[in-house]
């Protein structure tokens, strides 16, 4: 009778071992996903900082009004160049480059610009706001990179028309 128990005990132990392997894999996968998400957020924040720097550089070279014109032309539903300029001018102690990133993020995640600015003022990063909105960080990062490239092109070949200038 004792010999009959041994195979059953071995089978039960083998089944228990097999059941714990997938649970360990799921746990490891969850940790891997968190690391990947953290890395993606870090990359997005880095791209947002590069965009902010390029926006400041373009504003110094071309003027903020021109950057507002370019920004309005590359976004939809966030505001006209005039509305964006007025919104920025109403802010206190808010960096121009960070404002540009906030406008592009508002365009990409379909959240009100005021909400994004409030979260940035409260200390959240672009990456945290994007994660909270459950939007693909890689797409937002790509959008930021595309606009940064557009600003660089505009510095090399400045626009011939200022959207704030009135036509005679």
Report each predicted region and the residues it spans.
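Bacterial N-terminal signal peptides
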Residues: 12-22
């Amino acid at each position: 009778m004792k010999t009959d128990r041994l195979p059953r005990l071995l089978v039960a132990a083998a089944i228990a071992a097999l059941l714990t392997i997938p649970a360990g894999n799921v746990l490891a996968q969850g940790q891997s996903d968190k690391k990947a998400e953290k890395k993606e957020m870090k990359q997005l924040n880095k791209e947002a900082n590069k965009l902010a720097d390029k926006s400041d550089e373009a504003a110094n070279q071309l003027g903020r009004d021109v950057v507002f014109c370019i920004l309005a032309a590359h976004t939809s539903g966030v505001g006209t160049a005039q509305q964006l300029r007025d919104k920025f001018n109403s802010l206190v102690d808010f960096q121009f480059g960070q404002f540009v990133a906030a406008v592009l993020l508002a365009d990409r995640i379909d959240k009100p610009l005021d909400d994004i600015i409030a979260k940035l003022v409260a200390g959240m990063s672009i990456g945290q706001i994007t994660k909270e909105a459950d939007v693909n960080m890689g797409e937002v990062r790509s959008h930021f990179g595309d606009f940064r490239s557009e600003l660089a092109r505009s510095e090399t070949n400045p626009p011939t028309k200022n959207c704030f200038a009135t036509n005679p």
